[in-house]
Structures are given as structure tokens and as C-alpha cells.
Amino acid sequence: MDNPRRIIIGIDPGSRITGYGIIWSQGSKQGCIAFGQIKTDNDSLNFRLHQIERELRDLILIHRPHEAAIEQVFTFHNHQSALKLGQARGAALVATAACALPVAEYSARQIKQAVVGYGAATKAQVQHMVHLLLQLEKAPPADAADALAIALCHATSSRLSEKLMQAKGTLT
């Protein structure tokens, strides 16, 4: 069976800091290609959103991922924060669409479950597991670790989906 190497970009959107993590995945193995944070300037929101879109698009053009994964919006008590997060997420989705990149979405609970094995894991636990799973020299910053965790979650989830489809095909 052929297991091609796939490149996945994970995106953890934020209006001030957007984390990104780019991994390769082949079969049950994954490795880190790049990770970091897009720290927006202290401009008005529209300029920050444009910066997020532009920098993510540049990363996509440089690293040529096959797929993207992003965290779903979760419920906030502060409506303004939720709105800004949704707008940052929209800027990230525009960048992926501009590069014709398919996008998968995962809840925070799904991501933590896939990476830590516990859906209510702390940020520190996610950082630690990303550090271990990708054999990084040191733990990445929280936003980048979250983005790498999103990419790892997608690698695992999509691999399991492929196996289920193959098994279903053998049953019919």
C-alpha cells in the first residue's frame, strides 16, 4: 500500500497572535517542518486581519502544504473576543482558499484528545506532548504548539478516515 508524504499546516487563529505549525505525515509517522507565530502590529483590526491573511498565504506558498486544519470557534463569555477570533479565523480561511487548500476543522476537545489523550488537557500539557511527539529541541510557544497539535490531530484523524474508507470498500 502506498503512503504518500503529506504536508499539513495547522492554524491557531487569534487577532493579536496567530500560531502556525507545518508538519509532514506519512503513514503513522509525523515530523515538524516549521512553526511560529504571526504577531500582528498594533494597527486597527482590518490591518491586523490583512497581515494574518498575507503572512499565512506566504507560508502556504513557501511550504506548499496539501491540507490545512484549523480550530473551530468555541463559546466565549465575552462577545467582542468571540467576534475578533471569528474574524481572525476568517482571514486564515481566506488565505487557505486563495491557495485552493482544503481545510478541516476540529474542536479544542478533539485536538486535545488526539494529542494528549485527554479532551480537557491544559495548554502546558499540549505543549509538552507536541514537544515529545515531534521530537523538538524545546517546547514551542503556546500558540505555535496549539497549531502543531491541530496539524497532528488532522494527520491522525485523516489517516483513520482513510483506513475506515478502505475497510468499507473491502466489505462491499
Curated annotation (Swiss-Prot):
<keyword id="KW-0479">Metal-binding</keyword>
<dbReference type="InterPro" id="IPR002176">
    <property type="entry name" value="X-over_junc_endoDNase_RuvC"/>
</dbReference>
<comment type="similarity">
    <text>Belongs to the RuvC family.</text>
</comment>
<comment type="subunit">
    <text>Homodimer which binds Holliday junction (HJ) DNA. The HJ becomes 2-fold symmetrical on binding to RuvC with unstacked arms; it has a different conformation from HJ DNA in complex with RuvA. In the full resolvosome a probable DNA-RuvA(4)-RuvB(12)-RuvC(2) complex forms which resolves the HJ.</text>
</comment>
<keyword id="KW-0227">DNA damage</keyword>
<dbReference type="InterPro" id="IPR012337">
    <property type="entry name" value="RNaseH-like_sf"/>
</dbReference>
<dbReference type="GO" id="GO:0003677">
    <property type="term" value="F:DNA binding"/>
</dbReference>
<dbReference type="InterPro" id="IPR020563">
    <property type="entry name" value="X-over_junc_endoDNase_Mg_BS"/>
</dbReference>
<dbReference type="GO" id="GO:0006281">
    <property type="term" value="P:DNA repair"/>
</dbReference>
<keyword id="KW-0963">Cytoplasm</keyword>
<feature type="active site">
    <location>
        <position position="71"/>
    </location>
</feature>
<dbReference type="GO" id="GO:0000287">
    <property type="term" value="F:magnesium ion binding"/>
</dbReference>
<dbReference type="InterPro" id="IPR036397">
    <property type="entry name" value="RNaseH_sf"/>
</dbReference>
<keyword id="KW-0238">DNA-binding</keyword>
<comment type="function">
    <text>The RuvA-RuvB-RuvC complex processes Holliday junction (HJ) DNA during genetic recombination and DNA repair. Endonuclease that resolves HJ intermediates. Cleaves cruciform DNA by making single-stranded nicks across the HJ at symmetrical positions within the homologous arms, yielding a 5'-phosphate and a 3'-hydroxyl group; requires a central core of homology in the junction. The consensus cleavage sequence is 5'-(A/T)TT(C/G)-3'. Cleavage occurs on the 3'-side of the TT dinucleotide at the point of strand exchange.</text>
</comment>
<feature type="binding site">
    <location>
        <position position="12"/>
    </location>
    <ligand>
        <name>Mg(2+) 1</name>
    </ligand>
</feature>
<feature type="binding site">
    <location>
        <position position="71"/>
    </location>
    <ligand>
        <name>Mg(2+) 2</name>
    </ligand>
</feature>
<keyword id="KW-0378">Hydrolase</keyword>
<feature type="active site">
    <location>
        <position position="12"/>
    </location>
</feature>
<dbReference type="GO" id="GO:0006310">
    <property type="term" value="P:DNA recombination"/>
</dbReference>
<keyword id="KW-0234">DNA repair</keyword>
<dbReference type="GO" id="GO:0008821">
    <property type="term" value="F:crossover junction DNA endonuclease activity"/>
</dbReference>
<dbReference type="GO" id="GO:0005737">
    <property type="term" value="C:cytoplasm"/>
</dbReference>
<feature type="active site">
    <location>
        <position position="143"/>
    </location>
</feature>
<dbReference type="Pfam" id="PF02075">
    <property type="entry name" value="RuvC"/>
</dbReference>
<dbReference type="GO" id="GO:0048476">
    <property type="term" value="C:Holliday junction resolvase complex"/>
</dbReference>
<protein>
    <recommendedName>
        <fullName>Crossover junction endodeoxyribonuclease RuvC</fullName>
        <ecNumber>3.1.21.10</ecNumber>
    </recommendedName>
</protein>
<feature type="binding site">
    <location>
        <position position="143"/>
    </location>
    <ligand>
        <name>Mg(2+) 1</name>
    </ligand>
</feature>
<keyword id="KW-0460">Magnesium</keyword>
<keyword id="KW-0255">Endonuclease</keyword>
<keyword id="KW-0540">Nuclease</keyword>
<keyword id="KW-0233">DNA recombination</keyword>
